[in-house]
Amino acid sequence: MRTVCLVKNQQPLGATIKRHEITGDILVARVIHGGLVERNGLLYAGDKLVEVNGVPVEGLDPEQVIHILAMSCGTIMFKVIPVSAPPVSSQTTVYVRAMIDYWPQEDPDIPCMDAGLPFLKGDILQIVDQSDALWWQARKISDIAICAGLIPSNHLLKRKQREFWWSQPYQPHTCLKSTRSKEEFVGDGQQFFIAGFRQQHANMRCTCSCYSAVGAPYEEVVRYQRQPADKHRLIVLVGPSGVGVNELRRQLIGCNPSCFQSAVPHTTRSPKSYEMDGREYHYVSRETFESLMYGHRMLEFGEYKGHLYGTSVNAVLAVLDEGKICVMDLEPQDIQLARTRELKPYVIFIKPPSMSSMRHSRRNAKIITDYFVDMKFKDEDLQEMEELAQKMESQFGQFFDHVIVNDNLQDARAQLLSAIQKAEEELQWVPEAWVSPGAES
């Protein structure tokens, strides 16, 4: 038997306990990384508790033992029977981007709710312990000083996703937004919506990838810094129609065309008399265009007045090969097609300001469509823009590297230039597959 003395402070002890299913013994279930118990180094997972501050724990429930600990102040004395062989830690720290939201308070399966770590889509997590197949220990890099918390393992979340998926009634393939309620914390990050017409052409792509497999809840990431000899990263602008994405892209390229350039799109229509192949468009046959589509070499595509239009991976690479920064706008559901090792996109979400700000800044702005010319923004248009932005951020925010609120076009352009400079010059979190030798993206 061993006596362990801990001085309790304002922080949790950093350990969980459980009752052995057969013997009824109270055991240390796990030691939380960075907590008081781990720093003390005298209690290990598997140790049997005999006494706490002189009170025998035999026959007590774990909740009763926790109550004794909660009522204790200052020094806490444990009498324990050590595990026969203390675990040897050989954990490798891994960093991941969360692709889902997680709330421990809404998870009935978590072993200890108080030890749970809540996180949101896009958060970068440092996973410090994967020894448990179901519950990992992690901390947010924004709160690296605090002790770790419990998060569901990749295996557990995927299992929950599959169980949820198969428990739902069959619905026809509609490509409409998912009707999942907010309470379900294990969303798969693949809920989509109809984004409406783009000004150039309607997107004919099935927007939801609703026949695809369950998405990975975590994406392993590493720090990446572009070197001078490397190609520039593709800059992707995303935002609801009317927020100013096209205008920002146009102004960005116009302010420095030797640095920034758009990719030349492809089309199946015939060139007009004043057009030149490779300048306005790459003019190709429908067969060639569809071959690029089915080969996943089209980042975006759509059909307009019977003709196909789209931007290919090769067209983007042609700009990057010239040593320029390629800037393009994408619908959010197309971001994943661009997230490859060869393009390494930096995704910037252009977000509308408040309704009152939009009424002021866009009171003289016009909507130009195929049906109306110089149609002013109405409150319904602004409301739709705001709601669409919220949906984009909610469903695709894990892919956004930076967010700019376009309250003022001049300020937004300055922020855009600054964000691109940081993407080019500073360390950024990117998928591990983008930089690992021999990895496939």
Swiss-Prot record:
GO terms for biological process: protein localization to synapse. SMART domains: GuKc, PDZ, SH3. Residues 1-84 form the PDZ domain. InterPro entries: GK/Ca_channel_bsu, Guanylate_kin-like_dom, Guanylate_kinase_CS, MAGUK, MPP4_SH3, P-loop_NTPase, PDZ, PDZ_sf. Its main location: cytoplasm. Residues 232-421 form the Guanylate kinase-like domain. The keyword Ligase does not apply. GO terms for cellular component: adherens junction; basal part of cell; cone cell pedicle; Golgi membrane; lateral plasma membrane; plasma membrane; presynaptic membrane; protein-containing complex. Residues 373-430 form a coiled coil. Keywords: Coiled coil, Cytoplasm, SH3 domain. GO terms for molecular function: signaling receptor binding. Highly expressed in brain and detected in lung, and bone (at protein level). Also expressed in intestine and spleen. Residues 91-161 form the SH3 domain. It is found in: Cytoplasm. Belongs to the MAGUK family. PANTHER family: MEMBRANE-ASSOCIATED GUANYLATE KINASE MAGUK. May play a role in retinal photoreceptors development. Interacts with MPDZ. May interact with GRIA2. Forms a complex with CRB1 and PALS1. Interacts with FASLG. This is MAGUK p55 subfamily member 4. It comes from Rattus norvegicus.
